[in-house]
């Protein structure tokens, strides 16, 4: 982790691919993923819950509110884990003006 990240460290694409057979077997996962596709998804907090959901793995650690294949996906404020392993809000990191402009250009909420 960097003490002060740049836009390029924060903007990580989140891709999901489902086969035709999977989409036919689990149409609710496909529908929810499509419904959530334009939301401001945080890949770091959504990847693990989404993979557990897609695989049908039940565990007390699974948080479906962070799964993009769940009907009740909840947007949370974005945070960055700094070099002291502490979550910090993006607007409190001392990022450059250009980084915030790029976040806004890509419609990434913070």
Predicted features by range, described:
Residues 1-110:
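Catalytic domains that recognize anionic headgroups
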């Amino acid at each position: 982790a960097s003490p002060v990240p740049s836009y390029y460290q924060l903007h990580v694409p989140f891709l999901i691919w489902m086969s035709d057979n999977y989409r036919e077997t689990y149409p609710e996962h496909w529908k929810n993923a499509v419904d959530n596709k334009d939301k401001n998804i945080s890949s770091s907090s959504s990847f693990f819950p989404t993979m557990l959901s897609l695989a049908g793995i039940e565990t007390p650690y699974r948080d479906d509110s962070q799964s993009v294949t769940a009907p009740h996906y909840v947007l949370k404020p974005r945070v960055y884990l700094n070099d002291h392993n502490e979550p910090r809000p993006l607007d409190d990191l001392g990022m450059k003006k250009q980084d915030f402009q790029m976040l806004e250009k890509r419609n990434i909420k913070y």
